[in-house]
Amino acid sequence: MNRILFISLYTATLCTFLAGCSSDNWAIHAMPSSNQAADMLAGDLTTNQNWYLDESRYPQLTVPQNVRPCCAFGDMQKVKIGPVPVPFFRLNNVVELEEIGPHKFASGIYHYTPSSSSALGHGGSENNGILYTQKGGFIDLAHVRDTADDTMGLFFEILANLGQAHRIDLPAELGPRYIEMASFDASSLTDEQRWSVAAHLSARLAYFKAESHEIAQWHGYASFSGWPETISAYSLEDLYSNMLGAKIVLNLIQQHKMLSEREYNQNVSLLLNASLQELGVVDKSQSKLVLAAVDGKWWNSHESIPNKYMVLQRHYDLGDIQTPHRLTPELLGKENSNLQYLAQSPAIVLTLPASVESLDLDNIAKLVLEVAPSYADNFNHIPKRIWSERIEHTQFPVIAKYAELQDGQEMKALDVTEK
């Protein structure tokens, strides 16, 4: 959960006037080869060969610089600005499937898509929020969409530079963040294999970018000065949602269903909704009941945003295998027996392959997070032999485990209950 929706306090009115139209920021076309044209003319033959993409026509996409506001875990939370409670305000996070709006690449805080450009049968904003699924636990739609867009934003640059030493700069948090691509012999890869390797690298690195954000939040990074984001660090639904976004766009890239922004936006919208249905999404009233059932266990409704320990349960298990936090019969207990039917489905565990075409992906590209001196003291709980000013994504799981130990000690000292 990387941007708390406190900005809704002052953007709700403004957003009404920020309606715009979708536009194609990129549109490329596959080309038939001369052999395919000759075969067609000579014998009216059809071919199963894919048309090719001219590298000189690759769009100059980048990772989006603007990010979506996302949800603090819980429902109808109170908010404080400094020591002052915001009167008569509660943060309403929960949405349901029918309310989800059309996707927009790099939408930032707000974007309106007209119905003529939408594949969902209706226009509107993305209308992000959280919802509960029986097989995937809570899903934060802003996290899904951000990592989806990061995957898309990385793909063509990775594809164009595959096999070469290359650096891709990312928005800074704690310090510079970037992707280091290593030089290797890619001459034996076919065009289809290069496409597949680049697609998997893009999804994997976009996901690790999300992991680096969780680390940055825990160690003091904040999007807005004076508004701490420690409440959001390692929130239990974040990384599963991020990986879902990476997998959605990995699937679209593999099927070449993202060659224009319009096509990309429409297909993300369709596959996101289909994925939520497969995960067993419930309606808004049921999601609210689930949040109420885990109040005092996973979050504390008596605390206000941005108090870190409004969130009681966190997810520190980083890596390319993500298991969701879901209801269990034991968690619900007798007092929530009416929700036991939501705790019966098996979990869907998400994974991102570590190797493709016999290539170890971590050996050919790494995500790097550098720590500026102003944040170095926030890493004092971690032995120096484990971290340095430069942290690679393969070290992220160890960094997170030290955060888990530190949080456990703080919660015990504060007598904060975590069940």
Language model features with spans:
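Long, internal stretches of domain cores in catalytic or enzyme-like folds
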Residues: G226, S241-I248
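Divalent metal-coordination and catalytic microenvironments
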Residues: E214, D238, L244
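Bacterial N-terminal signal peptides
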Residues: S8-F17
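A glycine-rich, coil/turn loop motif that links secondary-structure elements
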Residues: I231-E237
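Bulky hydrophobic segments
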Residues: C21-I231, L250-K419
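Bacterial N-terminal signal peptides that target proteins for export
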Residues: M1-L9
